[in-house]
Amino acid sequence: MATTSNMFLYSLTIQPPTAVTQALLGQFSGTKEQQILTASGSRLTLLQPDPRQGKVNTLLSHDIFGIVRAIASFRLAGSHKDYIILATDSGRITIIEYLPKTNKFQRIHLETFGKSGVRRVIPGQYLAADPKGRACLISALEKNKLVYVLNRNSQAELTISSPLEAHKPGVLVLSLVALDVGYANPVFAALELDYTDADQDPTGQAREEVETQLVYYELDLGLNHVVRKWSDTVDRTSSLLFQVPGGNDGPSGVLVCGEENVTYRHSNQEAFRVPIPRRSGATEDPQRKRVIVSGVMHKLKGSAGAFFFLLQTDDGDLFKVTIDMIEDSDGNPTGEVKRLKIKYFDTIPVATSLCILKSGFLFAASEFGNHHFYQFEKLGDDDEELEFSSDDFPTDPTASYNPVYFHPRPLENLVLVESIDSMNPQVDCKVANLTGEDAPQIYSVCGNGARSTFRMLKHGLEVSEIVASELPGTPSAVWTTKLTKYDQYDAYIVLSFTNGTLVLSIGETVEEVSDSGFLTTAPTLAVQQMGEDGLIQVHPKGIRHIVQGRVNEWPAPQHRSIVAATANENQVVIALSSGEIVYFEMDSDGSLAEYDEKKEMSGTVTSLSVGQVPEGLKRSSFLAVGCDDCTVRILSLDPDSTLEMKSIQALTAAPSALSIMSMEDSFGGSTLYLHIGLHSGVYLRTVLDEVTGELTDTRQKFLGPKPTRLFQVSVQDQPCVLALSSRPWLGYTDPLTKGFMMTPLSYTELEYGWNFSSEQCLEGMVGIHANYLRIFSIEKLGDNMIQKSIPLTYTPKHLVKHPEQPYFYTIESDNNTLPPELRAKLLEQQSNGDATVLPPEDFGYPRAKGRWASCISIIDPISEEPRVLQRIDLDNNEAAVSAAIVPFASQEGESFLVVGTGKDMVLDPRQFTEGYIHVYRFHEDGRDLEFIHKTRVEEPPLALIPFQGRLLAGVGKTLRIYDLGLKQLLRKAQADVTPTLIVSLQSQGNRIIVGDLQQGITYVVYKAEGNRLIPFADDTLNRWTTCTTMVDYESVAGGDKFGNIYIVRCPERVSQETDEPGSEIHLMHARNYLHGTPNRLSLQVHFYTQDLPTSICKTSLVVGGQDVLLWSGLQGTVGVFIPFVSREDVDFFQNLENHMRAEDPPLAGRDHLIYRGYYTPVKGVIDGDLCERFSLLPNDKKQMIAGELDRSVREIERKISDIRTRSAF
């Protein structure tokens, strides 16, 4: 198979995966502050909790281009810094450290031990580090374990030994932890299951007798050897281990968690066992047993032996587990265990990892939905919850006991302080512009159970509005100003109207100021605080300089007026209507001195800008002048060459605004930029050489149809540019990548803006629109995707949009869940008064084996309060599996909602009683649904689409066409077209694209004259299809269950033959090839994304941008594939990608090319995520790559930036 292609795409991630597989706590920066490290897909993210504000901020996000299997942290004795161990699919163990100065991860060690990939005998699935940082054990799922000794050399550098083997064939590992043994030889505990006898016994008897064993592995540091120190049989259902503190802090050992029990075990201690309490309630199954799925141990400061565990069940209930120790005569714990105790603590969503911070917070990385950051109110010591002790229960796991129960309740010990957006699992996604804005929005359904959500994603920065005040007139401009150079906050808001100026004071209340010294009878062009305590007001007829109540006026020359002005703390420049530039500078005595000569421009001046005075200097060296002849000129302001022209740049339209600013760049310093706004709505950013005044490296972006105005503002202590067109934008340096970003604000249109600072709002902005004054602030610069969510009832399965109205329809279903009618019956039957109904979004729905809860929801996403308009519950134990909106030609083109369901479904192995197709009629423009009828089919129909005024349904492996009848759907045509199961359908004209569960894509043609469905081409690979979309008439893009996205194309000759009239007989009798169709599809594009694609569509994301392929992934990823237009760009980015592979190899040692071609060699796709790491390289590597590519560094960065901004976010 050729790996070259005539189609090339550029892959970019818009939203990285948000499903956290593991999170751990550590002092990674070497200070006392704790950070949280999370692994999400191929990304490592370092989070910084802020206890004062109760927020979690992202410090660093790094794509390692590999699958993170496990992470662990350790600290060498005497050190204050935690190191990170990575176990990935690279077949190597990696040790990295976080460098806070450069905000990067640095690899310290990379040791190869096995093959790459995720294999059951290659270590990496489990990882444990000794609490004293002396060794780590990395284990495979089966057979192989390796121990590495960690130490430091004479230069105090971290060293790692050769691996020590602890292999045993025929053994499966279920869980692994390191024991806390103080400074004795390191010991690791593993839950193991020996299947040797069961593997060789054909009767299955040995399988029933398999035992789960707790095994201790000891590393003898003296002999440098690993021995199997101790093993004992534990409860057969055991699946999870937790480390118990040792040394001076506790008895050491482990907690072994199995089905409905937690047992303390250690080699030199008795076993102690407590049951996991069951929920009591009218709708709860009293026989259902719970298992522990996650937990955390926390040591309390101040006293030895003070620690507790928080263990979480699969319901989300947290239980506090404590260990009582026998005390000596002085009342000190001896290290010998007396009893184990468990009590209900609180209920939170099920988490993959729990982290307790020293500052009294709990971070819960949720398995599904948003992650949560809680604060401890209390530790649950003095509440009235029942506590169960090991004294009352047998240690023998086979012995009978009476189950214990508890009543779940709302949070008492924890309080939620922040919820971190996560779209995992993301089930379906659509792109539409429902709000009438410039760019479309992404609408997605995600989540699980009662915590499922419908989400609206919009490109932009979140804005917090502080004040929106109506004004007596319509102002044209607004400024804020301090009174003196040393003031911390602004004192005045100055508003310019067509016939005057209004000055307002900033304080507890905003009041008009009458003695400010400003001229209030004329409009204002500029306001600036100058010198120590002076104020400048520029108005059309002159300049007013106000110093300590004294007013000095500079009048404009006769018959001329001022048309533009700019100023900083030492300089003022004005432009007269005659085209002359007049320059003023502040004298040492605080007065304004006019430069003798005036500079005459060739056209009318439309805008001016003088930059801020650099630190340590007296003046800004350059003045930018924009004229109506579509040029920008740079004039010098140096004393030796005042108002001399340094450079000129031609523009495509007249400039409407200019701003000279110094901003941080990706080179590790700052660069002087000239920002240009044009009358055409285009924004330009160009580099202004600080020595010569030359303009280079121009980048542009279309912001909207209105003229662009620019204002320098400050956000998070960094200079930014506020650009106002048909909507407001903010240009800033990305905190993580240091690349320049131009992002829209999620806010109303503004006509003018300025910085704003007061006691209540330290760093905000003031803006005007029509007759409203608005004060607002921007909290976060890192996240440029705004999410709004609407809660759903059950796990969503599919999302469809009304063809004409702004409404969405979701089908939702949950397995093993009590449906509403059964819940109501059980509550009615409850006689003892215990009929409390807890909110399902916090506690989940009651479970019931074999039962389905399912519904159809109508969603209005754009009303003032986005909400679910109607919900239709399905009964008869049916679960909705597919949906489509179909216009039936027999009903004069009226559209109906068609929903496919399955009855009594079992997912594994696949079973069902029968399937149905429900038909609903729309009322009130789609706001209401009326049930028409349902049609029985043999299997649940997993795919439905409209087709030529009828319904096309995939029922099992049969493709059917239905028309609408009075009492049920009428079958019109059918054919068996795939070998396994139809899961997706697309159509264009007479061509139908069928996606099979296991066998990839099949092209089918519908011949109306014979009413036949004929498959004529299929794929060369057996792909496990999840989603498909037609790119054009011949090409189809799809995703599979293993994380691949591909494009296949039908050969042109075959495509033409199938569409010819009279080709039906030829197609029906064509000879099948290798048990498939007569023809094969050719592979054009193939790329491994590492997230399971759940939807893919062809759409445009930006104004005037080209069509892209947007895909969504199960773990919350949103990505795009951008087609290249020119071969020159393809060659450039291919060369850049090759250089990046060599100069910036993946952190964990995975080969990038092999990673992106995990199952099939990568074809026709360039990895944009890798190319975008160019800006993070050291300057010497950037220069080296630029030299190899025969380009400048800025040119490479511009091309990387342009390809994203022109087609994506």
Curated annotation (Swiss-Prot):
Associated with the spliceosome. Its main location: nucleus. It holds the Pfam family CPSF_A. PANTHER family: DNA REPAIR/RNA PROCESSING CPSF FAMILY. Involved in pre-mRNA splicing and cell cycle control. GO terms for cellular component: nucleus; spliceosomal complex; U2 snRNP. GO terms for molecular function: U2 snRNA binding. Belongs to the RSE1 family. This is Pre-mRNA-splicing factor rse1. Keywords: mRNA processing, mRNA splicing, Nucleus, Spliceosome. One of its GO terms (biological process) is mRNA splicing, via spliceosome. It is found in: Nucleus. It comes from the Eukaryota. InterPro entries: Beta-prop_RSE1/DDB1/CPSF1_1st, Cleavage/polyA-sp_fac_asu_C, RSE1/DDB1/CFT1/CPSF1, WD40/YVTN_repeat-like_dom_sf, WD40_repeat_dom_sf.
